[in-house]
């Protein structure tokens, strides 16, 4: 993974070269490359591109075949997706345009409190009395954070309150796709244990979560699954296929 900024093509080439080096492979060993994410059209060496919604759904169903509903919470969007019994997308909903329904909301809240994104999980973990953040706009949330601080609320309680707010929005989005178990949670924001715990508490039923930092790679892994299938279908007889996928992660 690499921070891309606006240099999406450069970032995609960088992570692709690094992946080849780590795998001990050459470019010619890769039969098919799929670009996904917001920068998918900027991946210069791709064979084709797919939406991150499709890729994340495929990644979720690959790891957890019983998945029927996927919640994908990333830095830019929140997506709820219903799948059929073979992992195809039946319906989906995205959050409203405002960043309050995305990881950017938590990043901005942390910044207002004087913390980095990497500190969010540890900060929220020591909260004792979460302070609700009622604002529906990540930009206007700054004034609400300042107000809570002036009233004596701790940064930890404000941070956890922001997570509670984000979880409430995610559950509402899931209801709009007529959610049903099994649920699978993906996206970079699912790195924060307190958010995962709250979502599991709200949903009930079977909730699947990839371990460690893997939730943020679900779309890339799903693209790899699609790439392998397409690479195998197009391979010449007798050729050994080592296929992969390219995914661009845009850091906000």
PLM regions: where:
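Short beta-strand-loop/turn "lid" adjacent to the catalytic site in phosphate-handling enzymes
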Residues: 1-4, 22-54, 81-82, 87-90
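Adenine-nucleotide phosphate-binding core of ATP-dependent small-molecule kinases
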Residues: 141-174, 216
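Glycine-rich phosphate-binding loop plus the immediately following alpha-helix
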Residues: 4, 88-129, 225
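Glycine-rich phosphate-binding loops at beta-strand->alpha-helix junctions
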Residues: 38, 175-202, 214-217
């Amino acid at each position: 993974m690499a921070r891309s900024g606006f240099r999406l093509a450069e970032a995609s080439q960088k992570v692709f070269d690094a992946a080849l080096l780590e795998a001990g492979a050459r470019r010619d060993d890769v039969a098919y490359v799929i670009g996904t994410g917001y920068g998918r059209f900027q991946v210069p060496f791709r064979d084709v591109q797919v939406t991150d919604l499709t890729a994340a759904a495929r990644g979720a169903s690959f790891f957890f075949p019983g998945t029927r509903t996927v919640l994908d919470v990333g830095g830019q969007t929140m997506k709820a997706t219903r799948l059929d019994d073979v992992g195809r997308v039946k319906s989906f909903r995205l959050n409203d345009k405002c960043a309050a329904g995305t990881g950017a909301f938590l990043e901005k809240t942390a910044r207002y409190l004087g913390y980095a994104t990497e500190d969010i999980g540890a900060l929220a973990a020591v909260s004792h009395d979460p302070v609700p953040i009622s604002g529906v706009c990540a930009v206007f949330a700054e004034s609400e954070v300042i107000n809570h601080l002036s009233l004596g609320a701790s940064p930890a309680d404000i941070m956890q309150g922001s997570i509670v707010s984000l979880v409430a929005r995610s559950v509402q989005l899931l209801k709009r796709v007529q959610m049903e178990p099994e649920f699978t949670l993906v996206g970079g924001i699912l790195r924060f244990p307190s958010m995962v715990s709250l979502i599991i508490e709200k949903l009930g039923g079977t909730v699947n979560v990839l371990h460690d930092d893997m939730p943020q790679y679900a779309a890339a892994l799903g693209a790899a699954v699609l790439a392998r299938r397409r690479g195998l279908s197009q391979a010449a007889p007798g050729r050994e296929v080592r296929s992969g996928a390219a995914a661009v992660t845009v850091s906000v």
